[in-house]
Amino acid sequence: MMNWQERIVVDPEICHGKACVRGTRVMVSVVLDNLAAGETPAEIAKAYHLTLEDVQAVIAYAAELAKERFVPLGSR
């Protein structure tokens, strides 16, 4: 399993404390927005000068957050 803790950082001095890829100012939310828009991990990596492992770490981080937080979706 991907150890996202080695690649994702939260630092109040960088991007106002938003989660970013280590050594960059690329926010996790930007990578996820691009994935949601249909971009491939390879396209995102190239566009933002990341590695595929960085993109995979973002996905693993998001999966971990999804386990921890309940977001109400409304009733049917």
Model-predicted regions and their roles:
Residues W4-V26, V71-S75:
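Short, Lys/Arg-enriched anionic-surface-contact patches
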Residues M27-R76:
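Long, charge-rich, low-complexity alpha-helical segments
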